[in-house]
């Protein structure tokens, strides 16, 4: 009973925070997960979880919070950004919110628009992430949402962990996946080469749109007066992702051994080269 009252209080506090954010001109970024429904789940609730003997996380864990937050955004008028969406229903709710003219934006990560729970062949902690990998219909909806403009941003949800934290069963491993060093190549390979997005749309969703949503007027585009935070991307090389070559100390990726095309050759921060391939 006390937990239930606490949840009500939190919802009231969240609504109040949204109203204040609206007054202050601040956007709300939401990780959509009803933690009261997770119940120890570690992967998508489907036949794969049953096969591996693991507790599942249903799509509704995400969907009910997406619905709640969109309704509160409608009530308060606050700008709402929904982070790392993973379900078909989340995409549809964002689409309907936009059709209604609500200030709602959404993002997708490469692991969610590429992999499904069917790719988890064994109990491997590198496939444990939050939200979890979903089903094929969810992947199709996420890709369609990116193609038709419903989903505004491609992000990484970059969450590095040590090998000790990830090289264990999914029930014991930490949630999270690294993405900074693979996102560009994965997006180019899976979305641009397949004709789902153009190169310019890829740049918009990975750079321009995020800057606009964050209110960073001096970033996100190549133009006079903008900060020279840039990457130079070579679309030609084809290679196999090798986690052992990552600059990051975090090697936790399910994409190790996957063949991709395209790589970041240079990274510039404020006009200075900070990375060179």
Describe the residue ranges of each PLM region.
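Short acidic-hydrophobic sequence patches enriched in Asp/Glu that either
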Residues: 13, 179-183, 247
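Histidine/acidic residue-rich metal-binding segments in metalloenzymes
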Residues: 10-154
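Short, acidic/turn-prone active-site loops that include or flank metal/cofactor-
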Residues: 6, 109-111, 177
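Glycine/Thr-rich phosphate-binding loops of Rossmann-like dinucleotide-binding domains
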Residues: 38, 91, 114, 162-164, ...
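His/Asp/Glu-enriched, well-ordered alpha-helical/loop segment
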Residues: 51-79, 126, 145-148, 152-154, ...
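Short, small-residue-biased leader/transition segments that mark boundaries at the very start
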Residues: 2-9
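C-terminal cap of metal-dependent C-N hydrolases
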Residues: 169-172, 224-276
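Short, glycine/acidic-enriched loop or turn micro-motifs at the edges of active sites
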Residues: 34, 87, 110, 160, ...
């Amino acid at each position: 009973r006390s937990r239930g009252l606490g949840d009500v209080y939190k919802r009231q506090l969240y609504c109040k925070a949204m109203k204040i954010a609206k007054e202050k001109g601040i956007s709300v970024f939401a990780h959509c997960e009803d933690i009261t429904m997770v119940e120890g789940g570690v992967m998508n609730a489907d036949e794969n979880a049953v096969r591996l003997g693991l507790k599942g996380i249903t799509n509704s864990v995400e969907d009910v919070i997406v619905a709640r937050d969109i309704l509160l955004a409608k009530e308060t008028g606050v700008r709402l950004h929904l982070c790392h969406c993973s379900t078909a229903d989340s995409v549809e709710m964002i689409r309907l919110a936009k059709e209604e003219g609500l200030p709602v934006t959404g993002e997708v990560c490469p692991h969610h628009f590429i992999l499904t729970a069917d790719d988890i062949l064994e109990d491997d902690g590198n496939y444990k992430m939050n939200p979890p990998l979903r089903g094929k219909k969810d992947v199709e909806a996420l890709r369609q949402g990116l193609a038709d403009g419903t989903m505004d941003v491609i992000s990484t949800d970059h969450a590095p962990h040590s090998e000790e934290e990830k090289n264990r069963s999914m029930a014991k491993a930490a949630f999270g996946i690294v993405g900074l060093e693979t996102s560009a190549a994965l997006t180019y390979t899976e979305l641009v080469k397949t004709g789902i997005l153009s190169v310019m749309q890829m740049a918009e969703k990975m750079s321009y749109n995020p800057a606009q949503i964050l209110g960073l007027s001096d970033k996100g585009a190549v133009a006079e007066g903008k900060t020279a935070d840039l990457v130079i991307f070579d679309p030609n090389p084809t290679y196999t992702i090798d986690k052992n070559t990552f600059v990051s100390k975090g090697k936790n990726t399910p994409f190790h051994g996957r063949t991709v095309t395209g790589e970041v050759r240079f990274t510039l921060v404020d006009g200075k080269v900070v990375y060179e391939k």
